[in-house]
């Protein structure tokens, strides 16, 4: 009886170890993987979006980073705001897509978004993202 219990305990311990290893790999997803899982369904793997309803993430976001309110915009839009990943992971995804899809259009002295900046911005969902974008993005054109 003891050996049967010991064998069952080893099996449970082995299964628990596999589960912990698998879950740690899930939580350690790269920014690219998180982008593919949570963003590419609408914005496509290439970041091109689906005009006119889903905006592109290519080139345009780099130019937006010169306007302070637009840094928050990237975090506060419904898709980013509600994605089921941590603030730290969202920060990595946004910084990754800025560099991956926008390196040629980022401001000369671009600073990556910080986790604190993302955490704070994520507290305030945009009620009307298009209106906010029109209001603050005009400042780039001025």
Predicted regions and their residues:
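Mature extracytoplasmic domains of secretory-pathway proteins
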Residues: 84-94
